[in-house]
Design a protein with these regions (language model features):
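Intrinsically disordered, low-complexity proline-rich regions
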Residues: 280-289, 293-294
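Catalytic alpha/beta core domains of metabolic enzymes, predominantly
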Residues: 110, 118-274, 299
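Alpha-helix-loop-beta-strand connector modules within alpha/beta enzyme cores
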Residues: 39-60, 93-105, 168-179, 263-268
């Protein structure tokens, strides 16, 4: 199960694109998408690909020549709508070139870009939007299959949770093609995270989906973090650092929000460092199995109500008092630590296990 994101810097700036890609890759991103609006951007994609540690998908609209140029530049996959790159000859040219290079094509349709006849059917009530999205996607898949191209991934994204669920359930019944999941135009960080987590999480729990992208009006790094957390929460990705923390209440007499964030950030940085080292080791060998590291479970609790119970189940735990914490290691009390030292101490013990 792969996590994807898409660059949002100038596609003609190779250095900026590569920097953003590497930043996402360091967080655990598996696939990075770049828009290719013109032939010059296709050349830039080639520069970026030569320096990229992960596969790149070229996002194509309207001009089939951009797809051909992206393939020549080394794109690992294409994302396009065969219906908007011209006539059958253009589709045939792209399909032949992709097949010759062994490059898959993702057929991606969105609720906001339905064909006029399908949009009219939705407006008239003769089709639901999910039905129209599925019909659009399958019609585009057929254009490729008619040219003998079978290496296809499909996405059909709506901008709300109920339509996303209905669309992908219909798609899963209608095709055996791998499905790329996501809620399109999901919004800013908070609502977008919630909408994607609910929709993508439900579909994955039902066994639907092969790749995901969490679309946010935010930096792509945040898309990656949310996507990985969705997979981890469902047991579909090796777990990273697990920090349990309470929501605080009037009993809390320590700055728990700050300390929990510091602990989480420090453990996440170490996790990314280990992941980077593991990937470098794998690249130097023929073994492509990702090394799974088990990170300790850490609890950061604000008071004695749930603190001792959480401490018993955690590898390392803090239980807040009045300006200080009790520190537990594998359920045993090892002492008190001042609030100013608490985050550092729990991270130190966690990394030593």
């Amino acid at each position: 199960m792969s996590v994807q994101t898409m660059g949002n810097v100038d596609p003609h700036d190779a250095a900026a694109c590569l920097a953003q890609l590497k930043s996402c890759a360091e967080l655990g991103c598996d696939v990075f998408r770049l828009t290719v609006p013109d032939l010059e951007a296709a050349k830039v994609l080639g520069e970026v690909r030569r320096g990229s540690p992960i596969p790149i998908v070229a996002d194509i609209h309207f001009d089939y020549r951009c797809a051909l140029a992206a393939l020549d530049a080394g794109a690992d996959a294409l994302r396009l709508n065969p219906g908007n790159i011209g006539g059958a000859e253009n589709v045939r040219a792209v399909a032949r070139a992709a097949k010759a290079k062994g490059v898959p094509i993702r057929v991606g349709v969105n609720g906001g870009s339905l064909e006029k006849d399908l949009a009219a059917a939705v407006a008239a009530g003769t089709l639901t939007r999910p039905q129209a999205l599925v019909r659009s996607a399958l019609d585009h898949v057929k254009l490729l299959e008619d040219e003998g191209f079978r290496d296809v991934v499909v996405s059909a994204k709506a901008s709300n949770v109920p339509e996303t669920l209905a669309t992908y359930r219909l798609l899963a019944e209608a095709t055996d093609c791998p499905l790329h999941l996501g809620v399109t135009e999901a919004g800013t960080l908070l609502p977008g995270t919630v909408r994607n987590s609910v929709a993508v999480g439900i579909l994955l729990a039902e066994g639907i989906g092969d790749t995901i992208r969490v679309s946010l009006t935010d930096r792509p790094e945040r898309e990656v973090k949310v996507g990985l957390e969705i997979l981890r929460s469902l047991g579909l990705r090796a777990p990273g650092p697990a920090v349990t923390s309470c929501p605080t209440c009037g009993r809390t007499k320590v700055d728990l929000m700050r300390i929990a964030a510091e602990v989480e950030d420090a453990l996440e940085r170490q996790y990314r460092l280990n992941l980077s080292n593991d990937n470098r080791t794998i690249e130097q060998s023929s073994n492509r199995t990702i090394l799974n590291r088990t990170f300790p479970r850490v609890a950061v609790m604000g008071c004695v109500v749930n603190g001792p119970g959480e401490a018993a189940g955690a590898d390392v735990a803090l239980c807040g008092g009045d300006g200080e914490f009790l520190l537990y290691v594998r359920g045993k009390l090892v002492g008190k630590v001042a609030e100013s030292e608490a985050a550092g101490k729990v991270v130190e013990h966690a990394l030593s296990l």
